[in-house]
């Protein structure tokens, strides 16, 4: 038992020392934690530790990130490298965004209040911007300036991909409305909807936010651009420090 605890602590310390972007972390740390610790613990003891949740039927785990007070990561229990994986474009593979959206309740618990949907965000970074070779969706509050931009230009977002009116966190994004995350694979929506995306998914980043209109969602897609110094980090649209969101209904 002591060896098992020390392994988990070592892995988590490895993640905690890298901060945003996790540069320099063991690229297999997340997979090791979920595959070797969380899933076996859930199966043997009905205890997902060190994860907060392991949903065996759903095929995912949720782990508290050591960066930020409220940030959680949804991680498939199936080994999937990241946004570039062809598996995510297979009709038989789920995209995990609906599961991540339901897991926002953990963010709300840490925030001490229910959060308006348009203040909650889900982000998948590009291959360039990540250091973990296991797909993970960042779940946290949206940055206040990004929320303001999305609210101000909500009417410009339609049912097909189009460039968003202004840069978000200094980077260009395309946006599209989604009515229900249970009815769409957001990775496939990106690959099929933006020219060239299918061929270079590794450079793409995806963010999903509750719609400012109060119904449905907004998906945002960016891409790494070395010339512009853009790594394709959708996580940059999130606020891991201070959640400015009011309580839901206020």
Q: What do the predicted segments below correspond to?
A:
Residues 1-5:
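Positively charged n-region of N-terminal signal peptides that target proteins for export
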Residues 6-17:
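Bacterial N-terminal signal peptides
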Residues 21-250:
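HIT superfamily nucleotide-processing domains
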